[in-house]
A protein has these predicted regions:
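Residue-level signature of catalytic and energy-coupling elements of molecular machines
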Residues: 9-10, 19, 79, 172, ...
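Short amphipathic alpha-helical segments
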Residues: 21-22, 91-92, 216-218, 324-326
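A short acidic Gly-Thr/Ser loop motif
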Residues: 10-16, 81-82, 204-211, 217-220, ...
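Short active-site oxyanion
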Residues: 155, 310-311
């Protein structure tokens, strides 16, 4: 009987770190019950770890808490990769092949690997995503098994500044190895976008605290990935600097305005000493700038809005009132909110929230990658205690009772002999004489 597998994933964002454990049965059923998070400020900027020691301590605490919840030891983790410098670069590899031999998967894998042979200035390749295949200059969805004299493969190289992955490696130096790195926006796209979304054309927009990631799909393939250095914290800081209030106050005001993207229709109320209409002016202006930058990604990807059927919106900032409507009006594409991965069952209602969609997607993706028999958690095992008597003494087994003998008949009193009777009489007489002398 195959044992269940446990998968541990970590997502390090600009405002918080989230760790979670999922359980995968031999039948493929995937569920998550345990999740831990820690908020932080300024230790991660634009998705890149700045204060390694602070984040290392947070990650260590999260894993220890998860170990206590599951009663086991975390042995390895899957770590999400995202950040400001993460983006895609298109690369092509051409190869002449023998026309009498069928193209194999091994050949495809070798050609794709060749795409990483050319170094990219100041960037590391963190993933490779195939985009299109051509056999004898004719595009094909799957070249394996086909015959031809040439093959061309177009791929997306997912690259980032070296510091992004370097600092992730540095913080995971306390004894728990990284099983694999997973590009977070690609994991989310794989898990929440439908086949129809990817085929007809869609744009996945993840609006976080300090970055906004845009992934564009068309004809079932990723065609563009970019990370913008803009997010929800920009709105907060505009209110903070414009109205001279503390950041925590600006954040609370932003969250409590009924319609922050429509200043003309905001209730004229004061929140923590701040005028709601005045704050809405700053929030609306900055949000308009972020939406304009998102729209620009279609131009950079050389894609028309007519080629994109929908925008799927996720991330902490995505829940702001009125954002979906304003984005749809500006970009002229219908917008909807993303949902948690359908293949993953969240058993704890307290953590079944959209704000954890990234770590849930990492767990779902890792469940596809983990090999049979592998696990990320060693559960504690307990055996019934064996008690020993002190001093090594072992009590003997009780012996069987002996066969009872028949009770003997009571013996009759023996008749006293003549000599014994005379002796008793003499003793009595002598005792009486002694007593008389004492009385005199």
């Amino acid at each position: 009987m195959e044992k269940n597998q446990y998968i541990v994933a970590l997502e390090i964002g600009s405002s918080k770190i989230v760790g979670a454990i999922a359980e995968k049965t031999s039948a493929g059923y995937l569920s998550v019950k345990y999740l831990q998070e820690e908020q932080h400020l300024n230790s991660v900027r634009y998705g890149i770890v700045q204060n390694v020691e602070n984040i290392k301590s947070s990650v260590s605490r999260i894993l220890k808490n998860l170990e206590g919840m599951i009663d086991g030891r975390v042995t390895q983790v899957y770590l999400g990769v995202s950040g400001r410098s993460l983006h895609s670069i298109v690369s092509e590899v051409n190869r002449s092949v023998t026309s009498t031999e069928a193209i194999t998967q091994e050949l495809i894998d070798r050609i794709i690997h060749e795409a990483t042979s050319t170094p990219i200035r100041n960037h590391d390749t963190v993933d490779i995503v195939p985009r299109a295949y051509f056999v004898d200059k004719v595009e094909t969805p799957n070249p394996v098994g086909q015959f031809g004299s040439s093959i061309k493969i177009k791929v997306n190289l997912i690259v980032a500044k070296p510091a992004l992955k370097l600092n992730l490696n540095r913080l995971m130096t306390f004894g728990v190895p990284v099983k694999d790195y997973i590009v977070t926006p690609l994991a989310v796209a794989d898990q929440i976008l439908s086949e129809s979304d990817r085929e007809l054309g869609c744009m996945l927009v993840d609006m976080g605290a300090e970055t906004t990631t845009v992934a564009i799909y068309k004809d079932k393939a990723l065609i563009y990935l970019s990370t913008l250095p803009l997010g929800g914290r920009n709105l907060t800081r505009d209110v903070m600097s414009g109205l001279s209030v503390r950041e925590v106050t600006a954040e609370n005001v932003k969250k409590n305005i009924n319609n922050p993207l429509d200043p003309n229709n905001v209730s004229n109320v004061v929140i923590e000493g701040v005028s709601a209409p005045e704050a809405a002016n700053y929030i609306s202006a900055r949000t308009g700038e972020i939406i304009a930058n998102i729209n620009q990604q279609l131009v950079d990807a050389e894609v028309s809005s007519k080629d994109i059927q929908s925008i799927i919106l996720i991330g902490g900032c995505a829940h702001m009132s009125g954002l979906q409507q304003k984005m749809a009006e500006t970009i002229k594409i219908k917008v909807r909110m993303g949902q948690n991965p359908p293949m993953l069952n969240v058993l704890n209602p307290e953590i079944n929230r959209m704000e954890y969609i990234e770590v849930f997607s990492l767990l779902a993706k890792a469940s596809e990658m983990i090999e049979v028999g592998e696990t990320c958690v060693e559960l504690n095992r307990y055996e019934d205690p064996i008690f020993e008597a002190p001093g090594g003494y072992t009590p003997a087994e009780p012996s069987k009772p002996a066969n009872p003998s028949k009770p003997s008949k009571p013996s009759k009193p023996r008749r006293r002999g003549w000599f014994q009777s005379m002796t008793d009489k003499l003793s009595t007489l002598m005792s009486e004489d002694d007593a008389n002398e004492d009385d005199q």
